Amino acid sequence: MNIFNNKLQEIDKGIFEIIKHEKTRQNSVIELIASENFVSPAVLEAQGSVLTNKYAEGYSGKRFYNGCEEVDKAENLAIERAKKLFNCKYANVQPHSGSQANQAVYLALMQPGDTVLGMSLDSGGHLTHGSTANMSGKWFNAVSYSVDKETYLIDYDEVERLAILHKPKLLIAGFSAYPRNLDFAKFREIADKVGAYLMADIAHIAGLVAAGEHQSPIPHAHIVTSTTNKTLRGPRGGLILSNDEEIGKKINSALFPGLQGGPLMHIIAAKAVAFLESLQPEYKSYIKQVIINAKALAGSLQERGYDILTGGTDNHIVLVDLRKDGITGKIAANSLDRAGITCNKNAIPFDKTSPFITSGIRLGTPACTTRGFKEKDFVLVGHLIADILDGLKNSEDNSKAEQKVLSEVTKLIKLFPFYD
């Protein structure tokens, strides 16, 4: 069999059908998972290119393999574009994921047993910020700060108190489910009081930072990590930034050979494409619309009587607290899924429900904003979500509401076609 003469449909009908059906699914639902987005055909083209064939251990100009001239150019482009996008002196585009980026920081700056202070998982933090289920909570002495019990906002006084008490080596500012802006300057002030490194994990808000819609952590944090998907609208991957080039040298060594072997050159090329797209004026307009849409979505749900955590949003995330409604996050997310609206169940701060059940749902606006949704469309989406939630409050069988909403979703989604 000559593999170069066969297309996917001919050689592997199973995978071909899976991809086809997933494409249909993405085209036919209202995608509200806050960590998801739709990349451009240009990003897809780079990611699916012959660069996937090339092994390139090491860094540009210092590879362990020959034949790296072209991939060196690709990586250099990605680095220079990332530095320009975030206005920083150092960028590493090799992390395979945001988690790998965070692990590289741990390896570069900490020793096993050192203390790390990060946001608790139930308050909106990430697994890699010290969760006991994660390496960060197993290898290091993890201490967590939370949010205020009344406002659900970060309590910076508590962060400072815990920092003074525990003297962390690393303080983390970042989240996976928090709808408000972060004060990186305040975090740095706290870090300096105890001699800690400050790491800003901007995986969710990188696009907002790049577009100038959120305070940049670059002037404040010693090190910044991110994913390249989500609001950056690039391929799934990681990114590390800094203005401290000495720390950058430590990060380089930690990532390779410390954590990873060969970088994924096709992904790095796709990152370069996404960074170029993010440097265009249209991208700033896109991010502004993402935030406007999130506020419209939150307001629409509030109008229908649903509790929005913190009373609203400053970014792309809307967290719906369902505790007073007697609905679990799992039941709500599953019912919405059947109605053509995709989101995820999410813990609410101080939630006593199992993380597999939860008391809330997390909604996000980046993906549908990419499709072209505007404020009025998200107002409608909010009402459709409320129709499903209302049905769940009144009956265990929500099929009637699901069918009605699915019909409305189908009409709406046809107005915004994207991948052919």
Curated annotation (Swiss-Prot):
Protein name: Probable serine hydroxymethyltransferase
Location of the protein in the cell: Cytoplasm
Signal sequence segment: none
Pathway in which this enzyme or protein is active: One-carbon metabolism; tetrahydrofolate interconversion
Main subcellular location of this protein, as a coarse class: cytoplasm
HAMAP family named among the record's database cross-references: SHMT
InterPro entries on file: PyrdxlP-dep_Trfase (IPR015424), PyrdxlP-dep_Trfase_major (IPR015421), PyrdxlP-dep_Trfase_small (IPR015422), Ser_HO-MeTrfase (IPR001085), Ser_HO-MeTrfase-like (IPR049943), SHMT-like_dom (IPR039429)
EC number: 2.1.2.1
Role this protein plays: Catalyzes the reversible interconversion of serine and glycine with tetrahydrofolate (THF) serving as the one-carbon carrier. This reaction serves as the major source of one-carbon groups required for the biosynthesis of purines, thymidylate, methionine, and other important biomolecules.
Reaction equations catalysed: (6R)-5,10-methylene-5,6,7,8-tetrahydrofolate + glycine + H2O = (6S)-5,6,7,8-tetrahydrofolate + L-serine
Species in which this protein is naturally found: Rickettsia bellii (strain OSU 85-389)
Gene Ontology CC annotation, any one: cytosol
Biological processes per GO annotation: glycine biosynthetic process from serine; tetrahydrofolate interconversion
Binding positions ((6S)-5,6,7,8-tetrahydrofolate): L121, G125, H126, L127, E246, S354, P355, F356
UniProt-recorded Gene Ontology molecular function terms: glycine hydroxymethyltransferase activity; pyridoxal phosphate binding
Cofactors that this protein relies on: pyridoxal 5'-phosphate
Short name of any one Pfam family annotated for the protein: SHMT
PANTHER family, A to Z: SERINE HYDROXYMETHYLTRANSFERASE, SERINE HYDROXYMETHYLTRANSFERASE 1
Gene: glyA
NCBIfam families xrefs: PRK00011.1
Homology family: Belongs to the SHMT family.
Positions of post-translational N6-(pyridoxal phosphate)lysine modification: K230
Assembly, per entry: Homodimer.
UniProt KW keywords: Cytoplasm, One-carbon metabolism, Pyridoxal phosphate, Transferase
